[in-house]
Amino acid sequence: RRQRQMCIRDRLEAFSRPLWALVPFWVGGGSDPEFEKIYRKGLAAGTDPENPEYWGTTGEYDQCYVEMAAIACGILTAPEKLWTPLSDTGKQNLAAWLGQINAHTIPDCNWQFFRILVNLALKSVGMPYSSELLEDGLCKIDSYYSGDGWSTDGASVQKDYYIPWAIQYYGLLYSKFAADIDPRRAALYRQRAQLFAQQFVYWFDADGAALPFGRSLTYRFAQNSFWAACIWAGLEPLPLPVMKGLIVRNFNWWLGQKMFDRDGILTIGYCYPQMYMAERYNAPGSPYWGMKSFLLLALPDDHPFWSAEAAPMPALERLKPMPYANMLVQRRAGRITAYAAGVNEGHGHGQFPEKYAKFAYDTRFGFCASRSREVLNQAAPDSMLAFVIDDNVFVRKVSKTWEIEAGAVTAQWSPFPGIEVTTTITPTATGHRRHHEIDSSFDCEAYDCGFAVPNFAPGYAESVENDTAEAHCDTLRCTCLLYTSPSPRD
């Protein structure tokens, strides 16, 4: 039974996520009768308890609630496509199926917005909804706010793309959907988006690549969806040509990557299919969460966005401390390096050391996901200080304390009981310097690892001479210089 439920939810995911693009396409005047028919029939069948394709009753923390958001936004913005054509029975069934989100517990995170959007949609078509749970969800979202536009994703302490493509994105949707009924919050969410934009722009390099950091990177070009939401909401935290440039360059960069399979279907991975870095909640339809960036298609033909020139990156600071994002960002020669403090919940979704606790994340270098902790090269601890103990590799999982300064990041951490490390990362004109103070109760080997250079790339070579190690290919080069100063115990 459980396997069948998971299969149904995987299919629902692949059905609902394209709506993030199709609904704006319809709102903007696009027409595709075949797709309209597919979605009307699908909604009717999936929400009919008597139909063999019924999506089923939901439970606690159900993945179905994630997929309800796209359907709810469709009802809010294109009811003539997804609501009005349904029979009276079909409308009752759809409302009842969506309403299940009010009868169960959902995670204390960005999922609160799914309940908010569903209740707004039900209210908009005169169906039963919960004003109490709507307000409760909004209060929880407000409680996540940290500062400078950043929020936590609920109880999770890490800051990642779930802030721009979830918390901020849905907040901007709410600011339009609820402008008349909740003007105070609508204005507040727009103000926070203004602040956030001044920070988030630092995550994009001059070529259009965005920072590879955090979980759910298989959503790929959803990286630019925050800018799309700003433009759709009529908000200009940056000049419109600058935001268009960010979006266009990011899309162009992604179109240059190997993200499609032979049939033109988005794969799970990042720049190419890669299952090591996949999340446990990923299914074949997961990458289509990136369709949220196509909110731009809802803009009318005469919107200034379509005629604006795509402007280059604005003038930005060389070093940008982001204390509310737990990182220091460096801009150098058009590229971005983020020095992360290693702040994360330390468990939950898996591979958090790789996705949050490396010392540096860079738009020109991808980061590695570990295959095994028993062999150094399979542990792939790029941009980490790796300790080998009893033939096992240990790295930073999470920092105990940290400090973000104007020119450095300092963190205290422990890879293994009996080993305490204080690491200070200082950006320089040509890269960065790492200073590690290690207090170990026993002998062990430690490897300070640089960025990952693909050894299958043209021109790859590596060398080690005295205290200098280098790896390079035709397009990337990483050089590491090692200085040691032993301080034996008294």
Place the predicted regions along the sequence by residue.
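Conserved small/polar residues in nucleotide/adenosyl-binding loops
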Residues: 3-10, 483-488
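Carbohydrate-active enzyme catalytic cores, enriched for enzymes
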Residues: 50-55, 94, 205-212, 217-348
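Solvent-exposed loop and beta-edge segments used for protein-protein assembly and interaction
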Residues: 12, 65, 284, 322, ...
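Phosphate/adenylate-binding glycine loop and adjacent helical scaffold
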Residues: 338-341, 345-409, 413-416
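Amphipathic alpha-helical scaffolding segments
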Residues: 140, 248, 451-454
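Aromatic-lined, polymer-binding surfaces characteristic
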Residues: 11-25, 32, 36-228
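Terminal-appendage/accessory-domain detector
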Residues: 1-5, 12, 16, 26-37, ...
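Extended repeat-based interaction scaffolds and adjacent low-complexity, acidic/S/T/P-biased segments
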Residues: 391-485, 489-490
